[in-house]
Amino acid sequence: MSDEFNGLDGLSDELLSAERKLDILTQFKAHVKKTLVNEQVCVKYFENLSRLLVERGSNRRRGNDGDDVVFALAHSALCYLIKRVAMQAQHKFQHDLIELIVSTLFSIPFADKKVWQSSVKALEAIYLAKPNEFCQVLNESIAYNGSIRTNVLLLIDELARMESSNGRNGSMFLQKFIPFWVQEMNTNDSISNTDIELIYDIVANRCPEPMVRSMVDSVIRESAAKVFKSRLVGKLNNHGSESDMKDDFDRSITHTNSINSQVFNLQNELQSIMHQAPQFPTVPAPEPISYSNLSYLIKDLESMLPAFEGSRETEQNWKIRQTNVTKLRSIVLGNVSIEFPDKFLELWKDLNLQYCVTKSALSLRTSLCTHGCSLVKDLCCVFNSMLDISIIENLWSCLAKLMSNTKKIANQNAFICLITLLSTVPFHSRLFNHCFALIRDKNNVSRLYSSTFLRILIVRFHKRLISQHHVYVEEWLQKGLTDAQTTIRESMRITFWYWFKVSPMSGKKMLNLFQPQIKRALENSIPTHLDINYEAAIPPQSKESSRRSSLLPKRFPSYAAPTQSSHLPRSSIKRSLTDLAQGTQSFSKRSLRTPPDHDMNIDLTSELTNSQTNPLLNRYMKREEVEPEPLHVILSKDPKLGLDLLQKYLLSDTKIGDEEKVQSAIVSLIRTNPKAFKPLLHLPKFYQLIPLNFSMVLLPLNDLDISMIETQFKTYDIINNVISILQSLEDKNSEWSIFYVRFKYQIYNFCFNTIAKMLNTVTLSDQLINELINACGKDMDAEKYYKLILNIYLADKTKFVRLLKSTSTASTKLKIANVIQKKDSEFKIKSILNYPSVPEPIVSPEEHHLLEMTMVNPLGKRTVSSNTVIHNSLEGLDESESNPNIIADEDNHSEKEDLVTVPPVAKNSVNTVSFVADSPSDSDNDDTKKNGSDVVDHEEIRDHEESHGFTKFGGFSKLTEMTKVHSVFQPETVDENVDPMEVDSPDESNLDQKSLLTDIFLKNQHQEGSVSPIFKPQELNNDPRHDYDSDMLSDAINGIEIKTNDGSVANRSEDDIKTLGTNMGSVSDPKTFKPINLAHFANDSLFSFELKFIDASIGIVNLTQLKLIVQSIINNGTFKMNELQYILKCFLCYDQEVLEWIHDQHELKDVWAITELLLSSSSSESQIPTNIAYKSIILTACLLTIDDELEHTVLKDSSISQLFEHIISLVAKLDTFENEIYFACTELRTLLLSQDNNKHLPSFLEKCLKALCDTKEQYIVKISFLLETINGIISSMGNLLSVDVLRDLAKTISRYTPSDVAEWRFASCTALATIYSQLISRSTPVGYIRSLMPLLDPSDFEVVRSLSTTKDATRRLG
């Protein structure tokens, strides 16, 4: 015979793919199953399959799931090959081959019960073919192979069980091994205590007591004898004494009956039911027949069959049949139930003795029918729990037909047999369904008997019915209590109170659903012996007259209306047997998802573990199971299975591993299928597993309210999560946006109901009220929304009006205001408007002409002057025409500028002139403030001749009505480098700045060398008004103090700074502090430019003002842009008090707290406030520079890590690279990466990779920034990164190289080039590096190589 598989040598070829091996194994398995194998190469088959199984089994232990299919197919093929060779060529099973097979099958991991069972079946074939050689190999394995010793012992136990089930003596089979076991236990030290216990259990279960005693006495080794002694003592404690063992064995047969007999006296109840049933005909019991040999039993059973072969019952064969039935009863009552129970039941099915019973029981002859029913009774009483479901169903089918027989004695016999059957056999769901189907039968007798059957089931298995079948029991009772037949209703009433006894909640619920007449009938039929605690309600007496009631049309109850059953459609009263597994939706879900309303302890451990038929397998078998899939993986792969498993974990005390990953999987599943969580929402433990806001989102989507969790969480937490949910509903950039679009209506209404329920118990915060106001007009129940708004308004009118007034959307204001005005007549819409009328100032007639062509511009609304302003000198200026005390703050009219600084005029000048106000009280002479803003006093102007187109007041004669009126004593601004972000910007931050009067009119703008203003003499005017103005001007000039300024960083050279620092250090305290050296930043950097600009724009600073600014920001959380620039200036000054305060660790932490506040507010806003974010980044750079110079760093690692996250968040919101925030972030990143300490770099790298993985929407700027950051980190860390880390980085980065976005391609190629250089420096082969970048085309890889060698590769990047 040719071998088409070549001895399966291909399975050992490592170059052969797994798919090809699967094809070979599939073909080979099909060949072995169908045809004979080549005997010449069968040993080679075994060797190759064994080698493959051992190899794949070791891979499975390491968790390689890819080998599972090959392993399963190879194991199945080996088992089929063993059976084929055992049948075809038994002589091939020699000692070496058997040893190879046993070692192979027991060395592989038994992750599945089927693998073990298949192996046992295959080894059984070898045992049947070569029993002596096989037993010898098993003994040798026990002695010399300790790794498989336990599995071999379990195999011997399985073979002993098979011997007993096949009619042979299992104890005789074990006699082949017991002497060898005793010898090994006495001499072999490698036998563990577990194996000794297993040996004892095998012998104790399969052998008689004397044999067990003999083995125990033969063991002389102390450790083994001690184990036997402990096992024997434990058995005696469990069973009481040796004399009681037999009684315990007999009682174990009725264990199923006693396990549910706590509520009822089982024996008394079953006897009572039997006494109430019709009396069974008296049939004499035959003499029992005992057998010592199974062959005689088989011969006698086979001799009974010919009498039942005929299809018809005749005068000749019915007596023979009755005789055979009587003999069969004798056999059943004999010793077969003790000696051959399993074999007898197998013969019952193999010889089809059920056919004989059916022929007898359904006979028209009463005598034969009675003997057949007696046989059924005896069979149930003797074998009871040993009967399997197939025999029980056959008996039920026969007796159900007999019960519907018109002959009364026949159906009574069937009724008594079924009572006996239900009273003895264990619970089966199919048997329950058969009984339940009787209540829908057309036959009245069947429906009548079904009430008794239900009573038996309640008495015996009430716990099982409550936990799994209570829906069907309620329907069963409902139909019986409303049946048209009175006898059926009366019988079912008794059964109802049995159900009420075990499940009062269900019984009370049914009583409330019944009509009054049915309820009264039930209350009048309570069995006294059940001691049911129930008080019947007294119905109210009817006040209707008997005459009136008699004249009304006669009404019948639903169960007794005439011809009711004939008029109702068949579908409404008959239920198909195929529908028995389905109940009403609400009840079935409750029965499966919630614990029943009784105190029964539910044990779910059996459902969480792999069950085995043999208990010794679960206890001793060393299953090297592959780790089961984690719960979060199951939730992702199969959500329904995962949720069911999660429910079992929550119901039991089983600990859930990887709670964070499980939580993440649950949250992802909530977004896709929120309604699948309804069963879990009834479990309190579920709410501890996920964040509260997701729990609150699930409640409305599953028709539940806040009362489900109200008692588990604090009201404060619930309200905070309502705010969070309301904020998320309108977030269009979130990955939950589609989810909220689908369920926004339900979530909004749930939030409104929750707030309304808690309105009286908590004080609503401003944030919550603002969120509610902003929700106006969204997809919601408008009536419910406005009702809630009105209640909040009535609770605190002042607070609500204030918040409504601050709302920016006018339409929202008007909608809510109109609703409130309808309910509250006192409410005025004008109170929420932000445009109050400003009264016109009263101007005297003599001054009216001065204002006709002049526009007064409030100081707070002006912009920084630019080159478009025409400057003029102060020559010819009337000193009485101006007042220096008009400077006021726009936002707070009580706050004055403490300092007005004139920047240096000459670039080479060291000293500058400063004008310091005398005191706030002296300068507070303006009495014309209105509505919180200062109005500039209009001065009377005399007519002067125009010279060269200019007036003597510095104005241009051609200016239109848009002319601004400014103070002529405002300091001069020489530096014209104006911040492009602050000039003429509509941003709110510019409007809030404290402005300085810098619009100075100079006569000759080209005269840069002029240090001080030049005043021209002028004739005095005798006008009294001029005298008054002149006095005011003199007082103001006298209050001016001229002092020198120490200078600034921008006006000093580096040598001057060093010299000055040395001089200051020699004069003052030895410990001096220096400002930030701008050399830390590149000359062309944005940071350097901005700091120089700030240094030139602001003069001297003082510590008091700095402390006030910092404290104000920390306490109030608000600030102005000029305050932020003032803080930056402090880093550049030479004031030792200021520098010492900045270098103090505690104060530096306060400034860092301000920086974190600014960055977090900038990153959390959907639209970035440009000025705030920009200046915050500069301040951060200054703080990092200062912290780097300190001896002990102040900034914590967590602060640096949080800073890096803020940077990523800011960059993620940018739409273009041409943005000052982007450049500032890149420079700050360079500063972070260039620090001497590299301890933060691994954290930065991790955050970059996480941000790349979390990016669902492709942000161009963000991804480019992250790739460039990774490149910088790799360059900075260098050899600190292992090859494995570089490999993972390469795989992650290479995903962006084939992109169509040019920036991504360039950044990824640059980063890959850095990785390439690092690997090349470590002598890594180029081929290996190429394998790390599988997504790169050859041309892309060449680009990476060229970039790594600093060649020009830009032509390839296009």
Curated annotation (Swiss-Prot):
The keyword Transmembrane does not apply. Keywords: Cell cycle, Cell division, Cytoplasm, Cytoskeleton, Microtubule, Mitosis, Nucleus. Residues 973-990 have a biased composition (Acidic residues). InterPro entries: ARM-like, ARM-type_fold, CLASP_N_dom. Its main location: cytoplasm. Residues 926-949 have a biased composition (Basic and acidic residues). It comes from the Eukaryota. One of its GO terms (molecular function) is microtubule binding. Residues 915-950, 970-990 are annotated as: Disordered. GO terms for cellular component: cytoplasmic microtubule; microtubule organizing center; mitotic spindle midzone; nucleus; spindle microtubule. It is found in: Cytoplasm, Cytoskeleton; Nucleus; Cytoplasm, Cytoskeleton, Spindle. Pfam families: CLASP_N. GO terms for biological process: astral microtubule depolymerization; cell division; mitotic spindle assembly. Microtubule binding protein that promotes the stabilization of dynamic microtubules. Required for mitotic spindle formation. Interacts with microtubules. PANTHER family: CLASP (PTHR21567), CLIP-ASSOCIATING PROTEIN (PTHR21567:SF9). Belongs to the CLASP family. This is Protein STU1. It comes from Kluyveromyces lactis (strain ATCC 8585 / CBS 2359 / DSM 70799 / NBRC 1267 / NRRL Y-1140 / WM37).
